Amino acid sequence: TYESVEEIRNLISTLSKDVLVIIDEAYIYYETSVEVPTARAVLDEFPNVFIMRTFSKAYGLANYRVGSMMSSAELANYIQTIRLPYNLNTLSQVAAEAAFGDREFL
């Protein structure tokens, strides 16, 4: 279900600042009915928000278990401290780099 950035902003503003909000933009590349489908703008207002995207849908990399994340620097630094045991293998990293670099494919 697509929610507008304003609806997302309104929801987040009602939550406690210690609640982690994860916005799933797995299908962002398929959304054509709005001018700016991403909730990226809320990252500047709310430091407790993650926006996550998968490469399995638009990039066709379901078997590689790769994606991307946007967040405040503070949350990104925290993720770096726990990421290592769950890091990607080399093949997944190479596939993700190649897919991400091929903007014409999208």
Stretches with model-predicted labels:
Residues 1-21, 27-58:
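Active-site pre-lysine segment of PLP-dependent enzymes
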Residues 48-106:
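PLP-dependent aminotransferase class I/II
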